[in-house]
UniProtKB/Swiss-Prot annotation:
Family the UniProt entry places it in: Belongs to the PurU family.
The protein, known as: Formyltetrahydrofolate deformylase
Catalytic reactions of this protein: (6R)-10-formyltetrahydrofolate + H2O = (6S)-5,6,7,8-tetrahydrofolate + formate + H(+)
Keyword vocabulary terms for this entry: Hydrolase, One-carbon metabolism, Purine biosynthesis
Keyword Signal appears in the UniProt entry: no
ACT domain span: 7-90
Keyword Cell division: no
Source species of the chain: Synechocystis sp. (strain ATCC 27184 / PCC 6803 / Kazusa)
Gene Ontology annotations of biological process type: 'de novo' IMP biosynthetic process; one-carbon metabolic process
Pathway(s) where this gene product acts: Purine metabolism; IMP biosynthesis via de novo pathway; formate from 10-formyl-5,6,7,8-tetrahydrofolate: step 1/1
The enzyme's E.C. designation: 3.5.1.10
GO molecular function, one term: formyltetrahydrofolate deformylase activity
Described function: Catalyzes the hydrolysis of 10-formyltetrahydrofolate (formyl-FH4) to formate and tetrahydrofolate (FH4).
Stretches that traverse the bilayer: none
């Protein structure tokens, strides 16, 4: 059984002594720090920190910890989160008709590689219901048209609330979410089938082939109101040549999409990402 830990993510205006204050807060309450990482963005004057400590002998209860830390955070003018290792995030997978990212995430989850709960799959097509059934996950098909999009998004938000979802993963969900939806539920990771900012939008492999590119890539990012412009979490590339046709590019691209999305989801579940100024610091 793993030791129970707490993970603090914090960002605040940079100033001397922040690390010492955080470490002292944990030490004086009998916490043992096991991981700590930090970054200072000098251009924005921002300090960013991730620290994880054992709770075995910690003298504060969780409500007391949150209350005590909030007082110090207020002094630091900090934005912060605290996560506990025994509270597994609840994840919803959204898909359309392509199954490669869905199957990869589900396999990693079943094997224990991704520490989370996956109680819900949402799709705008019925095609992948058999996969949900195979894994014992509830499947809800909500077809999207121009006329019913807002009503269906209301239904989707209700499902996220019903299933107490913490994170939505767009595992090749080929619908554009409205600004209102993203504002109401901002914890969304998308996999984009190109190395952003190159070739945003549809058919990137066809456009990449037409341009004769020498590498193709995949990008996992948080979804925002601006299409394919959210904070980037993870990226990767693979070399291609003039001998590769569009099908070759699609095949290689799908391999990248699987791996890049899985990395991004794992980083989020491990609370290793801080977002600021539409970009991320990843404490990998």
């Amino acid at each position: 059984m793993q030791n129970l830990t707490a993970t603090l993510l914090v960002s605040c205006p940079d100033q001397p002594g922040i690390v010492a204050q955080i470490a002292q807060f944990i030490y004086q309450n009998q916490g043992n720090i096991i991981h700590a990482d930090q970054h200072t963005d000098f251009s924005s004057g921002l300090f960013l920190n991730r620290v994880e400590w054992q709770l075995d002998n910690f003298r504060l209860s969780r409500p007391e910890l949150l209350s005590a830390w909030s007082q110090l955070a207020e002094q630091l003018q900090a934005t912060w989160q605290i996560h506990f290792s025994d509270q597994l995030p609840r994840l919803a997978l959204w898909v359309s008709k392509q199954d490669h990212c869905l199957l990869d995430i589900l396999w990693r989850w079943r094997s224990g590689e991704l520490r989370c709960e996956i109680p819900l799959i949402i799709s705008n097509h019925p095609d992948l219901k058999s996969i949900a059934d195979q894994f014992g996950i509830d499947f809800h098909c909500l077809p999207i048209t121009k006329e019913n999009k807002l009503a269906q998004e209301t239904a989707e938000l209700a499902l996220l609330k019903q299933y107490q979802i913490d994170l939505v993963v767009l595992a090749k969900y080929l619908q554009i979410l409205t600004t209102d939806f993203v504002v109401q539920f901002p914890n969304i990771i998308n996999i984009h089938h190109s190395f952003l900012p190159a070739f945003p939008g549809a058919n990137p492999y066809h456009r990449a082939h037409e341009r004769g590119v020498k590498i193709i890539g995949a990008t996992a990012h948080y979804a925002t109101a601006q299409l394919d412009e959210g904070p980037i979490i993870e990226q990767d590339v693979v070399r291609v040549s003039h001998r590769d046709n569009v099908d070759d590019l699609i095949r290689k691209g799908r391999d990248l999409e699987r791996v890049v999305l899985a990395r991004a989801v794992r980083l989020h579940l491990q609370h290793r990402i801080l977002v600021y100024d539409n970009r991320t610091v990843v404490f990998a």
